[in-house]
C-alpha cells in the first residue's frame, strides 16, 4: 500500500512539474504552454514586421503574442522576466495608418495619397503596466504565440 501511494505521489509531482512547461499542451521544445497556446520569448531584437514574419515561420499558426485576459498577460510577463530584462516587447497589435479607410471632411473620397512611411505598433513592458505604441520600424524583443 505504501508503494502505491509513493508511486502515485511521484507521478503527481512529475505531472505538475510538466504542466507549466508546455509539455501537457504538446508545445515544441523551448516553448511554454498556457490555456491551449504555446509561447516563446525571443531575445534578438527585430522590427515589428520582421518579428511577425519570424513568428509565422516558427510554427503553424504562429504570430506575435496577443492578449485576451489579465491572467494571460501575467503568464507572459512572468515568462519574459525569466528570460529577458527588456522593457520593450512587441505584441501583435498595430495600426497601419495608410491602410485605414480615410475620407475628406467634405465627403470626397481619398484618391491622392502622400502618407509618410511611419506606422505605429504596440509593445508591452515586462516591468510597467499598460500598452504603449512606437514606430514599427524600431527594434524590440518579442514573444511568439501559437495554438497548442
Curated annotation (Swiss-Prot):
UniProt keywords (A-Z) are: Disulfide bond, Hemostasis impairing toxin, Secreted, Signal, Toxin
- The residues the entry assigns to the signal sequence are 1-24
Give the location in the cell: Secreted
- Disulfide bond annotation, renumbered to this chain: 27-38, 55-144, 121-136
Give the main localization category: secreted
Xref: Pfam families: Lectin_C (PF00059)
| Expression sites (tissue/organ) | Expressed by the venom gland.
Taken from the UniProt entry, a GO cellular component term is: extracellular region
Q: Which InterPro entries match?
A: C-type_lectin-like, C-type_lectin-like/link_sf, C-type_lectin/snaclec_domain, C-type_lectin_CS, CTDL_fold
Locate the C-type lectin domain: which residues?
A: 34-145
Question: Is the keyword Secreted in the record?
Answer: yes
- Record keywords: Nucleus included? no
The Swiss-Prot or TrEMBL record describes its family as follows: Belongs to the snaclec family.
What more the UniProt record tells us is: Shows greater sequence similarity to the beta than alpha subunits compared to other heterodimer snaclecs.
Q: How does it assemble?
A: Heterodimer; disulfide-linked.
Its biological purpose: Interferes with one step of hemostasis (modulation of platelet aggregation, or coagulation cascade, for example).
Tell me what this protein is called.
Answer: Snaclec B1
